[in-house]
Design a protein with these regions (language model features):
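Structural beta-alpha unit
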Residues: 1, 77-116
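Small/aliphatic-rich secondary-structure junction motif
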Residues: 3-58, 82-91
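Short, well-ordered secondary-structure micro-motifs
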Residues: 18, 45-49, 102-105, 128-130
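Short glycine-rich anion-binding loops that position phosphate/pyrophosphate groups of nucleotides
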Residues: 41, 109, 121-124
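Short, hinge-like loop/turn segments at secondary-structure boundaries
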Residues: 50-54, 108-111, 134-135
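A short acidic, glycine-rich active-site loop
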Residues: 55-74
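Glycine-rich, Arg-bearing micro-motifs that act as flexible, cationic patches
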Residues: 115-140
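Short, flexible loop segments at boundaries between secondary-structure elements
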Residues: 144-152
């Protein structure tokens, strides 16, 4: 049924459940698997005038990018260890300086994936409104089915 799966993780405990499900599904279906983690660009406040804005120095940008790269490396190393433990082959991808939902949708499209697997934190009410939901954005903007793994009870 599914032959090319994109599995998204941010390294959180909730995402780990998504990784477990995605790995098991890819193994059961003998599907090609890409595991992706996305790190966002350094948030910059250009302000609305006067001296309210903050623009980072190049050193701050470089430091942030290095920290994101290190974090993404750990996230993907953890996913790699989980894949090796159950004998599932995968490709591993870090997309830096990107909006997660957009990067997930674009990667699924460019790699010809026919399923996206991701976990959701299950935020509700105002928390969801203000914090947003990458999963919701992928569901709305994606063109392939999305398997959503809920936060464990």
């Amino acid at each position: 049924m599914y032959t090319n799966i994109l599995l998204s993780t941010d390294g959180s405990d909730v995402a780990r459940k998504g990784v477990e499900h995605g790995l098991a599904l890819a193994k059961a279906l003998n599907a090609r698997l890409t595991i992706i983690t996305v790190t966002e660009a350094l948030p910059v406040d250009y302000g609305g005038g006067h001296a309210s804005g903050w623009i980072p120095t190049q050193e701050e940008v470089d430091s942030y990018d290095a920290a994101c790269k290190a974090r993404a490396g750990k996230v993907l190393d953890d996913a790699r260890a989980m894949a090796e433990q159950i004998g599932t082959a995968a490709e591993f991808l870090h997309v830096p300086n990107a909006h997660p939902a957009t990067a997930i949708v674009e990667t699924a499209k460019s790699r010809g994936c026919d399923l996206i697997v991701m976990a959701t934190h299950g935020r509700r009410g105002l928390r969801k409104l203000f914090l947003g939901s990458q999963t919701s954005e992928v569901l709305v903007n994606g063109s392939v089915p999305v398997l959503v793994v809920p936060k464990p009870a």
